[in-house]
Amino acid sequence: MIDIQLLRKDIDSVAARLAGRKFKLDVAAFNALEAERKQIQSSTEDLQNKRNTLSKQIGALKGKGEDTSAVMAEVAGIGDELKASAARLDIVQAKISEFMLSIPNLPHESVPVGTDEAGNVELRKVGTPRSFDFEIRDHVDVGAALGLDFDVAAKITGSRFSVMKGGIARLHRALAQFMLDTHTAEHGYTECYTPYIVNADSLQGTGQLPKFEADLFAVKKGGQEGEGEALYLIPTAEVPLTNIVRDEIVAGDALPIRMTAHSPCFRSEAGSYGRDTRGMIRQHQFDKVEMVQVVHPEKSYEALDEMCGHAENILKKLGLPYRVITLCTGDMGFGATKTYDLEVWLPAQNTYREISSVSNCEAFQARRMQARFRNAQGKPESVHTLNGSGLAVGRTLVAVLENYQQADGSVTIPEVLHPYMGGLQRLTPQA
């Protein structure tokens, strides 16, 4: 969440910045809650002062041997009033907390202003799209002859799922292993294995809850309906990785913390009805290698550029043409202050499609998680958190299938993946 002191000091300025994100801050509602909070706290202080004064009177009366029953009764009554005030304050504080959790992060001053993806700014293009001397086929047609099957997946589960068999399944696995090895050996990340099911506190910490519950898959525990707390399938490994530091105070010299994980991701794709219904671009279940960094606040934008470079390195090694864009204010994710999207060239679509999103969240997630470090003065201070795809495995497979397809229906395997494929250099159509 954003710093509440910013609202208390200059709420109109905050509202103006949020307007660039297409978010209308309810200034009147916040001011009303703040006024109620101040009134309760002021009356509480008055009651506490009155109780202290009366307590001193009781001591003086006892010293004189006089009757204290009336004053003690008054003190008891004040105690009841204080309990009622505390209960009222808890209710108001809960409303303020709920209000704060609904507010997206403030965009960094360097982020271009825009209402949607049309306002995004291209930073660079890397690699030249290949020229084909035969009719280009999309990954669905190429993959069908190599063991990619959507019909069987639909029978097993439903739409937006896939089954892979044989060489294409191995290629999918090879991509994930290659990404992990690159991030750990070359980029300094620690590989992690995390739960694929998380609690609501974890999702609130990274910003998916309470606002985006419709995008999640909730888990119903067999035979335990109604028992315990709600659990959810992870929409990204960002959630468990980032929550490793929830409710922690880490040593300043332990920063930066770099973590990576390969996991399945599960998304309901609410609001995506009718979009990318063909193929693997938008599925309910997909694999991703995630990068997360927990850094000193002064280092987070340096880390953002570094992480973008780490994701780019994967694409360069695979020989896939791509571009980097800076998202505008109206197209950024809820928790981000600045985001770079990497888009890979898909020849069958004749366009670039997102394959990675790398974001700096500054202290937005850290405040929600109470994730802190000890600064040079030894005082706890919020860390900054960053996350990024390094990369989405399924979409990378799509890009390899389309960019490396051959006229005979085979797919040449990028050289960097040969060691992961047992030396296999080409996938050929299955008989």
UniProtKB/Swiss-Prot annotation:
Its EC number is 6.1.1.11. It comes from the Bacteria. InterPro entries: aa-tRNA-synt_IIb, aa-tRNA-synth_II, aa-tRNA-synth_II/BPL/LPL, Ser-tRNA-ligase_type_1, Ser-tRNA-synth_1_N, SerRS_1_N_sf, SerRS_core, tRNA-bd_arm. Disulfide bonds: none annotated. ATP binds at R267, S268, E269, E354, I355, S356, S357. It is found in: Cytoplasm. L-serine binds at T236, A237, E238, E290, S389. Pfam families: Seryl_tRNA_N, tRNA-synt_2b. Its main location: cytoplasm. The keyword Lipid biosynthesis does not apply. CDD domains: SerRS_core (cd00770). Consists of two distinct domains, a catalytic core and a N-terminal extension that is involved in tRNA binding. Belongs to the class-II aminoacyl-tRNA synthetase family. Type-1 seryl-tRNA synthetase subfamily. Catalyzes the attachment of serine to tRNA(Ser). Is also able to aminoacylate tRNA(Sec) with serine, to form the misacylated tRNA L-seryl-tRNA(Sec), which will be further converted into selenocysteinyl-tRNA(Sec). This is Serine--tRNA ligase. It comes from Janthinobacterium sp. (strain Marseille).
